[in-house]
């Protein structure tokens, strides 16, 4: 079947739940109290890598193609087994640590306006980058199983939606690896936040609601929680223009269109040179024109900063400093490097033509800045970072 589609000319496969294809054929009895531990019986079973290697050897290696696997239950220590080119299995594998971060961590500083640990997020991306040093990372912040990217990691309030969407775009397109984009994030689509259970299609949301009612709990609490975390937030029709159903269909869509389609849509954003969509196009071109942002090494700076994410990308003589404020409040970042020869290449506010040399950099709410650094001191500085890592 894979050969059939490759012969038709497709470019690759996104392999759903690929880490679950090998099972324990003895079907052992498992203590129900150990439910969280049963991954070992249906995920990462030893024969999994034999199957993937066979798939590569017999099919994938015969075509100019791309393969990416969904890494359910795959931890950072396991990923190299999937993507190390020497093992001849997959090109890429995406994990769920980024998606879980808001549910598994507490804010570093509640006053920052960030409702998860940015320090943990930075550590997580850094560990995964290091783990696939011999392979290739997958970078994403949203997909069909997650709420909208700008609602989850930025702010969908009118004041900050465009700025935070542009900041997140800058992050994804300056990290090492292949960035994955979910349709609508390039125009800053937001969570729809349905008020009624009848408006939801997602079986997970519906089952949570039914379970709460059956157990005598407050079903409204489920609805309130799903407004922020529910998967249907990202599954509403794509917003093309201001026409009925956002120009997506002349029929009745599976979910209601987000009412904000009258001002968040492709047609309007294409006409606005300062829009999220045009910024997205600009940064895509910027990435293509600067290979260091694709293939360069990655080095985290100011790791314990609870508001900003600062890192270096480098290859050859080119060094770039990326500074991102993930919060709705001003942040001070201390990259710890000489900024005397730095110049601004890209910023999401659109008014940073230069930056005065200083030890501490003040970033405005959700600000993103990309600097180019060309100075001999950076060579020894980055070498020292390599030793620390």
Give the label of every model feature segment.
Residues 1-389:
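Active-site and adjacent substrate-binding regions of carbohydrate-active enzymes
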């Amino acid at each position: 079947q894979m050969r059939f589609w490759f012969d038709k000319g497709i470019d690759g496969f996104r392999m759903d739940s690929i880490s679950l294809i090998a099972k324990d054929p003895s079907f052992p009895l498992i203590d129900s109290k150990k439910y969280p531990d049963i991954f070992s019986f249906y995920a990462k079973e030893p024969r999994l890598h034999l199957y993937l290697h066979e798939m590569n050897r017999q099919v994938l290696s015969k075509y100019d193609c791309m393969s990416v696997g969904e890494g359910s239950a795959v931890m950072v220590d396991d990923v190299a087994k999937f993507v190390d080119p020497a093992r001849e299995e997959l090109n890429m594998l995406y994990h769920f640590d980024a998606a879980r971060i808001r549910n598994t961590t507490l804010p570093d500083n509640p006053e920052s306006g960030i409702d998860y640990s940015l320090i943990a997020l930075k550590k997580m991306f850094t560990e995964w980058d290091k783990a696939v040093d011999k392979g290739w990372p997958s970078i994403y912040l949203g997909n069909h199983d997650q709420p909208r990217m700008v609602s989850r990691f930025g702010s969908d309030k009118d004041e900050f939606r465009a700025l935070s969407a542009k900041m997140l775009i800058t992050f994804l397109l300056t990290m090492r690896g292949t960035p994955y984009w979910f349709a609508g994030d390039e125009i800053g689509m937001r969570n729809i936040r349905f008020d009624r259970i009848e408006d939801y299609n997602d079986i997970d949301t519906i089952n949570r609601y039914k379970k709460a009612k059956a157990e005598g709990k407050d079903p409204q609490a489920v609805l309130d929680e799903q407004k922020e975390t529910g998967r249907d937030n990202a599954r509403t029709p794509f917003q093309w223009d201001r026409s009925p159903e956002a120009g997506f269909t002349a029929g009745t869509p599976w979910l209601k269109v987000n009412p904000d389609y009258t001002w968040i849509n492709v047609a309007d954003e294409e006409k606005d040179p300062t829009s999220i969509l045009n910024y997205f196009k600009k940064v895509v071109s910027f990435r293509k024109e600067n290979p260091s942002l694709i293939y360069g090494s990655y080095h985290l700076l100011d790791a314990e900063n609870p508001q900003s994410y600062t890192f270096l990308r480098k290859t050859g003589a080119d060094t770039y400093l990326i500074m991102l404020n993930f919060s709705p409040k001003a942040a001070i970042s201390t990259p710890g490097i000489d900024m005397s020869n730095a110049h601004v290449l890209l910023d999401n506010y659109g008014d940073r033509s230069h930056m005065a040399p200083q030890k501490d950099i003040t970033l405005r709410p959700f600000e993103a800045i990309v600097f180019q650094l060309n100075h001999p001191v950076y060579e020894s500085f980055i070498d020292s970072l390599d030793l620390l890592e």
